[in-house]
């Protein structure tokens, strides 16, 4: 739990000064931020007069607890305290064991809780515990777990780490996938609508060693054709360095990735903000159920399905401009060779949006 020292209560009682930190929750009433905030110069007499003293058991006066929550939040908390059984109360971590039984017994003996302050009268529950109990009722553990799992998914599969708020603020992205012969990209807005989708032939990887200047010239030429976007998403290959036979291909991928990071991150030196991110290739494969063991299968049929749905469905998973949907489909059908980079660039863009905004299929980790 996060604590903020500037939200502390200093209370003068019986010649002793006591400090009570208050937890900060976004869902709480704004009143929380003003609770007990006093200037250091406030006279002790006035401070003591304005806030009641704590008793010897460390229990805070009831009125302080009520000021932390809005009337709606108090009503929600009281509803749980007055209607839940002891087993249901145990779902909240701090009420496991004897505390949940004490709440039910207190309710039977004295009637329903009329205010949050009366919670402090329950045995084993003091002010600090009461605050944590109220917070856990407002923000159940499963909701916190879902949020932390969501952050874990983004941290694990999208690198470098970027705040989710910033990811959600993007208006468009360019998804880039490169192979041994070509670089493909898909430009999508957040609807998501395909704004641009194409590829460029760059090289045919052979045993020949290419100088760095060759990579710079080839990739710079491609970058000049790529549309501007808020973020650029690159595919992170799953090739292992342990497989020595694939080392030339892995080296080629790493050089290409480094070049794209440098050429597309044009403002990084000024603001330190990453505009180029990498997403794990197999994570996208799992998102669309394209994995067979550790091997990712072709996304060709899935892309054809997206194209068909964009014409037939009112709310397709991906939107294509009508004049381009037929053109793209014909290109895929007529292609004599597999253009996997083109398929993968689109799937990667869709997976990115669905992971960030939580729509579509859930990632199977």
UniProtKB/Swiss-Prot annotation:
Gene Ontology biological process: mitochondrial transcription; positive regulation of mitochondrial transcription; regulation of oxidative phosphorylation; transcription elongation by mitochondrial RNA polymerase
Residue ranges that the Swiss-Prot or TrEMBL entry lists as coiled coil: none
Swiss-Prot/TrEMBL keywords: Mitochondrion, Mitochondrion nucleoid, Transcription, Transcription regulation, Transit peptide
Gene3D superfamilies: Ribonuclease H-like superfamily/Ribonuclease H
Pfam families documented for this protein: HHH_3
SUPFAM superfamilies noted in UniProt: RuvA domain 2-like (SSF47781)
Primary location group: mitochondrion
Protein location: Mitochondrion matrix; Mitochondrion matrix, Mitochondrion nucleoid
Transit peptide: 1-40
Gene Ontology terms: cellular component: mitochondrial matrix; mitochondrial nucleoid; ribonucleoprotein complex
InterPro entries the UniProt entry points to: RNaseH_sf, RuvA_2-like, TEFM
Sample GO molecular function, one term: DNA polymerase processivity factor activity
Entry similarity comment: Belongs to the TEFM family.
Its job: Transcription elongation factor which increases mitochondrial RNA polymerase processivity. Regulates transcription of the mitochondrial genome, including genes important for the oxidative phosphorylation machinery.
Complex and partners: Interacts with POLRMT.
Protein name (Swiss-Prot/TrEMBL): Transcription elongation factor, mitochondrial
Source organism of this protein record: Rattus norvegicus
Source organism phylogeny: Eukaryota, Metazoa, Chordata, Craniata, Vertebrata
């Amino acid at each position: 739990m996060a604590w903020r020292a500037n939200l502390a209560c200093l209370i003068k009682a019986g010649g002793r000064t006591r400090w009570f930190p208050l937890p900060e929750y976004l869902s709480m009433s704004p009143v929380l931020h003003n609770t007990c905030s006093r200037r250091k110069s406030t006279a002790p007499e006035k401070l003591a007069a304005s806030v009641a003293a704590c008793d010897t058991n460390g229990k805070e006066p009831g009125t302080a607890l009520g000021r932390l929550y809005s009337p709606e939040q108090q009503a929600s908390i009281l509803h749980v305290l007055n209607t839940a059984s002891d087993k249901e109360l145990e779902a909240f971590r701090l009420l496991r064991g004897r505390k949940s039984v004490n709440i039910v017994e207190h309710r039977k003996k004295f009637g329903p809780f009329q205010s949050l302050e009366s919670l402090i009268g329950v045995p084993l529950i003091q002010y600090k515990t009461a605050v944590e109990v109220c917070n856990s009722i407002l923000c159940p553990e499963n909701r916190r777990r879902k949020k932390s799992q969501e952050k874990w998914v983004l941290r694990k599969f999208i690198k470098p780490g970027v705040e989710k708020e910033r990811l959600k603020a993007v208006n468009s992205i360019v998804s880039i996938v490169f192979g041994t012969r070509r670089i493909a990209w898909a430009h999508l807005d957040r609807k998501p609508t395909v704004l641009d989708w194409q590829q460029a032939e760059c090289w045919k990887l052979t045993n020949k060693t290419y100088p760095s200047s060759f990579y710079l010239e080839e990739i710079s030429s491609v970058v000049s054709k790529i549309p501007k976007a808020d973020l650029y998403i690159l595919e992170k290959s799953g090739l292992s360095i342990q497989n020595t036979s694939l080392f030339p291909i892995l080296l080629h991928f790493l050089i290409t990735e480094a070049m794209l990071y440098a050429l597309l991150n044009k403002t990084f030196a000024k603001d330190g903000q990453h505009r180029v991110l990498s997403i794990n290739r197999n994570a996208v494969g799992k998102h669309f159920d394209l994995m067979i063991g550790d091997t990712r299968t072709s996304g060709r049929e899935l892309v054809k399905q997206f194209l068909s749905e964009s014409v037939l469905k009112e709310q397709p998973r991906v939107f294509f401009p009508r004049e381009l949907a037929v053109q793209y489909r014909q290109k895929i059908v007529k292609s004599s060779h597999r253009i996997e980079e083109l398929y993968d660039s689109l799937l990667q863009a869709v997976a990115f949006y669905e992971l960030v905004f939580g729509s579509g299929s859930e990632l199977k980790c």
